[in-house]
Amino acid sequence: MIDPYQKGKVYTMNKKELVKLAAAVTAAFTISAAAGFGVLSSSFGTGEKSYAAETAVTQTVEITRTQAADTTSTSETGTTANELNMTTDGAIDTTDIFTDRDLEQTADLSEAKTYTVSDSQTIEITSEGVYVITGSASNASIIVEAGDEDKVQLVLDGVTITNDSIPCIYVKSADKVFVTTTDSENSLSVTGTFTADGDTNTDAVIFSKDDLVLNGVGTLNIQSSDNGVTCKDDMKITGGTINIACEADALEANDSIRIADGEINISTNKDALHAENDDDDTVGYIYICGGTLKALAGDDAIHATTIIQIDGGKLDLNAHEGLEATWIQINDGTINIAASDDAINAAYKSAKISPTAEFNGGYVTIVMGSGDTDAVDSNGNLIITGGTLDITAQSPFDYDGTCQKTGGTLIINGTETDTISNQMMGGGKGGRTGGRKGW
């Protein structure tokens, strides 16, 4: 009989997947391994299983800032917002969460200005428009300091920038900035200790104080001694291929991270996706409705203060913890998690909502390490109405509130079951046991 908790089974069963990801991320960069970035040593699940979407429940908390649609068309390709696989009655209000322009993958270059980066020089952009960036340089920076209502589109067309201590792209002010790749390879890296801009800790290769959209049809490689991309407002990813290798958080935002499409590959010693606002615990959420994400993270793969809502996409996550937020809602998608602590952890991160782990659809595969680890850990309630949960773990569930199972398929250590056993092995990392219920 095979012991499903044997360490070798958990951590070596998909070794080739890990090797492929690590190679894909590191080989994409023009900076060699001499920069000193660490690589972890676990594995991804394959997760090649079909699934049927289920209807989401209707409990809603409105934490999304409603934005007027961008009316200027700048593209020949891309989907529209009403074509996305979005749950309209989920945890997050998805109304206007993406504009049509967010989803456009190519820029209108008819009135674009072109700049070529050069060593130790700064390109300053102070007004709305489309700007094509080309060339290779060291210690160069693109600084956007435009008006509060200006939308700026930076079109990266075969750009390589290698810096010692300053962001390659620094958005000081604008309404929204689009970083769009052409059908080209673009590499941005910072190898040394970041230098602050006055009181602003500019700690990322791309650092934005305002809304940021990453999209396009090409490849963007980011390598950092700290964070990969930091946004102090809302960050959206709607297309392109993005490869990030960094020491700290790969994608970090204050208000939200929203992913509609694209191919994202991350190797980091901290969090792959991190949304947190120290001043407002009603924001700091992560929404995913498409694309692919492969993340190898030393801490959390996806971490949010308030809500993680997944409506679609394919996620392969290998981390200390897979998903961590106050309310985690999975409505669709294919999600594979290999974790050494809790794979899914609904903990007290926000005082505005109650910890809930909720499964309404999709196919979720979880493989846990041995020891005091939980596949699904909720400091509040556990809700299962649909989808498939395929768990290999000593402790499949640990919840402090109530459990409601009205549908879905549950597979525990290879056996389909309708029984949920509460392990009660203690609160998850960063959470508190017992306590607040409701809003």
Map each language-model feature to its residues:
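A composition-driven surface/loop motif
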Residues: 2-439
